[in-house]
Structure formats: C-alpha cells, structure tokens
Amino acid sequence: MTGIWDVRITDTSLRDGSHHKRHQFIKEEVGAIVAALDAAGVPVIEVTHGDGLGGSSFNYGFSKTPEQELIKLAAQTAKEAKIAFLMLPGVGTKEDIKEAQDNGGSICRIATHCTEADVSIQHFGLARELGLETVGFLMMAHTIAPEKLAAQARIMADAGCQCVYVVDSAGALVLDGVADRVAALVAELGEDAQVGFHGHENLGLGVANSVEAVRAGAKQIDGSVRRFGAGAGNAPVEALIGVFDKIGVKTGIDFFDIADAAEDVVRPAMPAECLLDRNALIMGYSGVYSSFLKHAVRQSERYGVPAHQLLHRAGQRKLIGGQEDQLIDIALEIKREQESGQVASRR
C-alpha cells in the first residue's frame, strides 16, 4: 500500500478508545475491528492499553485482556496494515518494546509531555536498533509556544524519531494554534523527520484541526473510527476520509468501507458514543488531558461532586497525564466547600 497516500492515517481506536472502554477490550472485538479497518485500507492500526505499554495498573486501570495478546492478535489478523503500539517512558519499559515487536508490532510510538522529550532518547535508540519504525508524541502541545515545541521535536528527531507528532491531548488547540505548531516543527525538522498531528474533539475541531495540520505540512494524521477515544473522542476517521477526499488529499482508505466499519463493527464494541457534552467541553476549554474524563466521573460518583467542576479545577492546576490521582484531592476540596456552604466557582 506504500505510495498511495499523500497523508498516512493511523487509527487509534484500539488504543485511545481503550480509555473510553475502561481498557475492557476482548479478543473478539479487537479481531473484528482490525479486520474491518484493514479491509478498508487503513495503513496503521494502534493497539495498546490506553496509557501505553505497561499501563494496566491500579493508577490507570487494569486491562481485561493483556495488551501483548491483543497486539499479537492484531498482527495476525491484519493482511496489509502495520500494527503500532504506544509507550510512555516511566510507564512502559524497554523490555515491553521488545515483547511488542516479538508479537508483531512494527511501529513504536513513544510519548512524553511536551517539555520532556529528553526522557525518550534511550527508548528511540532501542527502537531503531530493533528495526522498528519510530514515532514521537509531544503531548499537551497547547501548553507551550510553537518554537519551544519545535525545540523538543528536535531532541526526538536527533534521538532517532522518524515522525514527531503535535499531540493535542486536551483538544484545546484551535485552528491557527495547530497550523503554527505544525509549521514550526516542519521548519525545524526539514528532511530529518516527518510531522504528524493527533487531535481530540473536545471543542469539536478534530477534523478541522487535522486539515489545518495537513495544510501546514503534516504527513501523518491520527483519528479513531466513530471518534472512539478519550474525552469527546478523536477526529473520526470516516469523517477525515470524506473531507480529505473532497479536498484532494489521498489517504488510500475507501470512504464507504470505513463508514461501514464505523457503523457495523466499531459502534457495537463501544460502551456508548463519545459525546461532546459539558464534561468534554470543559476539558477542551480548560486544557485538561482527555483521559481524565473517566477518572473524573468515577471520583464524581464516589464523592458526590460535579465532574465538570473537577475537570475545570484540574485545568486550573495544569495537571498532566499521570496525575489523575490528584482528582481525589480536588474532589475532597469541593466536598469540603459544599459542606461549609460555599458555592464552587466555575472560574
């Protein structure tokens, strides 16, 4: 399939969607989804726990099915698509990378907070030694200026990363904010590495932001069929393909086949639709890491406080991925205010 696209699409519904499903995928679902996406022409399918290799834990949530078994199943099922896996240094290990490759994964996507690219250096080195394709994720990209993001991308590229992504983890970037960051990375990296974009729908701009990214020079774009991802979900792949078809951007994915996959295969595996509701909007507006949604809902139910207030305060505190446990502190703070008669502020 190489060479039939202007932009390469990675479907992340079996990784980012794991957040929405509370990491409860079973083999039958993964096999069916991989087969449908592969048949539609999706070139890359990401499969892992929502928080990457090794993410199954008390802090992030336990997987129903071991992720390495799902990676192996996906690789055995796909006829054309490559299987990607995500790892976060400090969550996953180098041994996890080796095992994922042994199970058929061929693209290693390494994610760090957008100011901490240096922690990925040894992992990129290992991935390249193993012959894996490498992708870097600079998460929460809305929190730093384009030129600073580009400097972090340079660290990843020099370490062996072949494509660095601007990752809008909170769905907080708006159009020009995406274009400016992608353009800054393109200018910095030149021919040394490609640039990608990973969006969320928390302000309803996942598709529009992806178009802006491509126009600014991005060569790889993430999405999830049926928006199956954290928060309000990712840019829906079926919509991305429809839009890219209309503006003349080749993806190699058949629009009708991917629309069928979204409706007939992916939707039945989802616990519910990914909604652009108040909680999701608050995350986009306040700049909250999208995977906080389910954690906030759980603490809301546990302590009897509004989830949207938890999320807004998480944004005020500038919490990042890995700090989900601080939602408990925020919930207790709001609970004390309620009991003392104070009205929790939205601002």
From Swiss-Prot:
It is an enzyme of class 4 (lyase). GO terms for molecular function: 2-isopropylmalate synthase activity; 4-hydroxy-2-oxovalerate aldolase activity; manganese ion binding. The keyword rRNA-binding does not apply. Residues 7-259 form the Pyruvate carboxyltransferase domain. The record marks 15 as: Transition state stabilizer. Pfam families: DmpG_comm, HMGL-like. SUPFAM superfamilies: Aldolase (SSF51569), post-HMGL domain-like (SSF89000). Mn(2+) binds at residues 16, 198, 200. Keywords: Aromatic hydrocarbons catabolism, Lyase, Manganese, Metal-binding. One of its GO terms (biological process) is catabolic process. Belongs to the 4-hydroxy-2-oxovalerate aldolase family. HAMAP family: HOA. This is 4-hydroxy-2-oxovalerate aldolase 2.
